[in-house]
Amino acid sequence: MSGTTREYKLELQDEIIIPATREKVFEALNDINILKECIPGCEELSREKENELIAKVTLKIGPVKARFGGRVILDPSKAPSAFSPSGEGDGGIAGFAKGGADVELIESDAETILRYTAKAETGGKLAQLGARLITSTAKKLSKMFFERFLRVMSGEIDLKK
């Protein structure tokens, strides 16, 4: 095998209706306790600076289980109608992942339509797993995040335990 580094890029888009006002949704998407509850595999999440988070996440992607240490930058410049988080994580021998999202929050009566486009790039062993596995895993993780987020926003998950 050659010494070249393999990389894989993907893009996901979706729209979710959340039973809360736009301001509450924006606030929740920036709440460290809510994010920690919703991010699949999140073990640690802390605020480094006002708009910068440090995370440790363990994920299994196909046969590869990796613990990522990473950083997320939150860009609240268009708050509360939109924001653009971006980040990168290093999974050691498993490789790396980096990406970002453009998130739009649209008011609709007492609900909010959350529309996003996320782009990600993986490298190392992760990229060698193939496009189909990486894309299906990314979709699954995204679905898990938003299912948990909806449960938190609807009060089904109580973070004040």
Predicted segments, located by residue:
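A conserved amphipathic terminal alpha-helix motif
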Residues: L126-K161
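Beta-strand/loop substructures that line and gate deep hydrophobic ligand-binding cavities in soluble
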Residues: G89-T137
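Hydrophobic ligand-binding cavity/cleft-lining segments
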Residues: M1-E52, K56-K60, K161
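Hydrophobic/aromatic beta-strand elements that line small-molecule binding cavities or substrate pockets
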Residues: D14, E43, G69-P76, G99-E107
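Intrinsic-disorder/low-complexity, polar/charged segments enriched in Ser/Thr/Lys/Arg/Asp/Glu/Gln
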Residues: K9-E15, E52-I54, R67-G69, A82, ...
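Hydrophobic pocket/interface hotspot
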Residues: V25, L29, L35, L74, ...
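Glycine-rich portal/gate segments that line the openings of hydrophobic small-molecule binding cavities
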Residues: S46-G89, M144
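A generic structural micro-feature
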Residues: R6-Y8, R47, G62-A66, I93-A97, ...
